[in-house]
């Protein structure tokens, strides 16, 4: 049986960020996903940031996350929202090329030390060593 320091189940945005940070800290990390080709798949309105989310994206970036870095590599348009109002309510939004983002995220994860496992997590047994 293989030993991992961390096993992340699900490769959505949060799962990718969790696996990324664990890998950066040198932890042996496995990332389980049903379909590797779905890594980095964005919603139908692919954007990062905006009025309510710019601060969250910035915090993830400052803490070593990857979403903004991959977003910058995949952006097709940037806009600062609410410029007619004060700086306290400005929000940067990047429109993202969905296919390019997925391609860049897959490349990033596959060049890391994260072990991708294409499977389902059905029955978990935790063994303390």
Q: Where are the language model's segments positioned?
A:
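Conserved small/polar residues in nucleotide/adenosyl-binding loops
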Residues: 127-129
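N-terminal Rossmann-fold NAD(P) dinucleotide-binding loop
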Residues: 15
